[in-house]
Swiss-Prot record:
GO terms, molecular function: ATP binding; magnesium ion binding; protein serine kinase activity; ribosomal protein S6 kinase activity
Organism per entry: Xenopus laevis (African clawed frog)
Name the UniProt record assigns to this protein: Ribosomal protein S6 kinase 2 beta
Alphabetized UniProt keyword annotations: ATP-binding, Kinase, Nucleotide-binding, Phosphoprotein, Repeat, Serine/threonine-protein kinase, Transferase
Residues at the catalytic site: D187 (proton acceptor), D533 (proton acceptor)
Pfam families the record matches: Pkinase (PF00069), Pkinase_C (PF00433)
Summary of activators and inhibitors of this protein: Activated by multiple phosphorylations on threonine and serine residues.
E.C. code: 2.7.11.1
Keyword Kinase: yes
Amino acid sequence: MPLAQLVDLWPEVELVHEDTENGHGGPEDRGRHTSKDEVVVKEIPITHHVKEGAEKADQSHFVLLKVLGQGSFGKVFLVRKITPPDANQLYAMKVLKKATLKVRDRVRTKMERDILADVHHPFVVRLHYAFQTEGKLYLILDFLRGGDLFTRLSKEVMFTEEDVKFYLAELALGLDHLHSLGIIYRDLKPENILLDEEGHIKLTDFGLSKEAIDHEKKAYSFCGTVEYMAPEVVNRQGHSHGADWWSYGVLMFEMLTGSLPFQGKDRKETMTLILKAKLGMPQFLSNEAQSLLRALFKRNATNRLGSGVEGAEELKRHPFFSTIDWNKLYRRELSPPFKPSVTQPDDTYYFDTEFTSRTPKDSPGIPPSAGAHQLFRGFSFVAPVLVEEDAKKTSSPPVLSVPKTHSKNVLFTDVYTVRETIGVGSYSVCKRCVHKGTNMEYAVKVIDKSKRDPSEEIEILRRYGQHPNIITLKDVYEECNSIYLVTELMRGGELLDRILRQKFFSEREACSVLFTVCKTVEYLHSQGVVHRDLKPSNILYVDESGDPESIRICDFGFSKQLRAENGLLMTPCYTANFVAPEVLKRQGYDEGCDIWSLGILLYTMLAGYTPFANGPGDTPEEILARIGS
């Protein structure tokens, strides 16, 4: 891949060390420094020449759909373009108020726009348009439906080494490309790594990036998130692209362990730890992972892996990445470890409902100071691919029958009328309900939030509910104490009721049912999902025909998506009659527990009773004794 020539694009800029967030002395006060009230930053003209076409964009070309996020400088919206050549395309629109930006932050914003306009890489977010009004700046970016890596990390606490290896490998290619353009990223952290709908990463938020350095030049400004700062950034000795590889190591450590390597009780202590503390290496990590971390956590930047003239090539040769095919990775031919469960084009499941529930409104910006107009001259930008594209006719994306999580101010009873109870479980109750607008009948599972977190069940149903033999999730509502899962109504009742009515099934009947169930379980296992509670009462018929093809596997309340390094699960969830012995022993279990349950299911259909019949008060030890006898 040809690389851009390094040129000095910022010859007039001197970003004198910016203030820290507190007034502590110590390591953060070393070197060149300005006081909190004396930020010295020179305003600079835009020097980039971006191909601009007749199709310049403005805010009237976009319809606001949702709020994705909000900060002190402005908001990020989900928007739909309504003018050609890309009508109906969804984007993320970053809106920054000029009047609330300090001069320093205005420079950063302009840098972000210039960097994004120049960078074209599969693992870096793409800028499509940039424009301004009297009071605001607008960046139109890729809308990445998978949310950020921080959200996924906070949910899973820590990742497997294989997961981490994949994310780090894609990240290394993205960082290496930025470095080849003379850009230091300087703010590498999980919040700035987004996931697209396939699960591939995209680097975003270039507000702290420093452009146009080469390996002989250094930046001196104090910036970034303190826990991810390299020692040379902390002590202001000057830093180059090697600072990003230290942050890369911090990110690796956090993903593998669920904690940060250097974190004190406050900012000052954290910085002291970064400069002086010995790294506590978790011994559960592989030798290769430990070796890579040690190579990245070199306090002398010249000795740090990736900091030499070879850059990321050094890192790519490390044994930790021995299984990565870098060419296939760059072409996005390797499957990500996690695919976000998004099917609607405007799905915001992975974004904070605190923001997505708000009414999207782009309020008028306060006019900025006169000097800001000069600073943002030339800010407008249209992606060349859009300029060159013919005004193609694009149809609106199809509206799919997939669930949305409604905000807490929309009540389930506002939309549905609740009817009789269908079934009662340990953590939930199932009722029939009727949609007030369409008069269509559905089932609703009402889950007590204080007893169980249904997020895994919702995610599995959202992702795999389109399978013909898995119950379809229609809607999700969240209220103060309950979650409402609206599904298709199973009018044919449970397989258990059918067995009880007939006493037992013929071999032909049992074979047909088991074939359909096995096909569905095989599909779930191929997707890394273990049901963990297969039994006749969780297998229902969608209608009265009794056709095995009308069977739906339901109740994914105990289900789990396999994520452990060895693929085994340790959480004991079961229905006693159908539970596998390895579940009772808590020895770790995988898809095999579902296969055991299928055997119990077949026995029950043929015999009319379970092979290891038990009373309601039986302990796991008593059930195991029967299984082993």
